[in-house]
Amino acid sequence: MQDIGFELEGEYVELNQLLKLCDIVDSGGAGKALVASGAVRVDGAVELRKTCKIRAGQVVELEGVRIAVQAADG
């Protein structure tokens, strides 16, 4: 499984945008489609809300990829 660390700049990032920012998908629309397919898990549970707010400390998993979201320093 590929591990990706994502440094969160604000309070949260929308799930579909996180997938785009981590180069999992090419666009926010593709991210929405991937989430809608049921292929994405947040903290171990399937997440179907495309714009679910992902905050520091959460883990997103899909298709052999694990994204650990961390707060930005400072």
Per-segment meaning from a language model:
Residues 1-13:
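A detector for short, charged/polar N-terminal pre-domain segments
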Residues 2-4, 38, 65:
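Generic structural motif recognizing short loop/turn segments at the entrances and edges of beta-strands
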Residues 13-56:
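A basic, amphipathic helix-loop patch mediating RNA/tRNA/ribosome contacts
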Residues 47-74:
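C-terminal structural segments of small proteins and small subunits
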